[in-house]
């Protein structure tokens, strides 16, 4: 029995074409053109308490370099042009620390999209975290870290940073 598979062109302005679907590094650059302005980054919302890690305060980022079928973060990933507002690292840190203090959290993060978009913004945010009592959980799919060794090494200098790499699956159960 032969199963015919229709080849789908996944390319659009937010998803550069690639022979096997899309190129996550090209998609990183495309996403950054939408969600980064200088040292400012787009967020859908700031500082919400979550139960993960025994309690964490998280900001919801906009933009990603993957297009996972089972992703729960639909609008911030698929419609970054019309989602969120731009915030400076100081604004994000202030909102996170205020909410974290209210809930007694020592962990803060920015999640629900790709955490490594906007390196300047990320590094400035991590410098603020390093001078604080908090630990920042960087949630990433790891594509940019694997592609750019210097970026990964630069992250290693931050003492209050925990990097969590999320390995994606090929079906809903694995994801």
PLM region spans:
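"Short basic amphipathic alpha-helical interaction patches in structured regions
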Residues: 73-76, 85, 123
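Short cysteine/histidine-rich metal-coordination sites, predominantly Zn2+-binding motifs
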Residues: 82-95
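Conserved AdoMet/S-adenosylmethionine-binding subsite of the radical SAM
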Residues: 93-107, 111-175
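A generic structural signal for short coil/turn motifs at secondary-structure boundaries
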Residues: 80-81, 175
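Short linear motifs at secondary-structure transitions and domain/linker junctions
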Residues: 31-38, 85-86, 137-142
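Conserved active-site and cofactor/substrate-binding residues in soluble primary-metabolism enzymes
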Residues: 59, 87, 120
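N-terminal [4Fe-4S]-dependent radical SAM core
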Residues: 2-65, 69, 73-80
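Bulky hydrophobic/aromatic packing residues
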Residues: 62, 66, 70-73, 92, ...
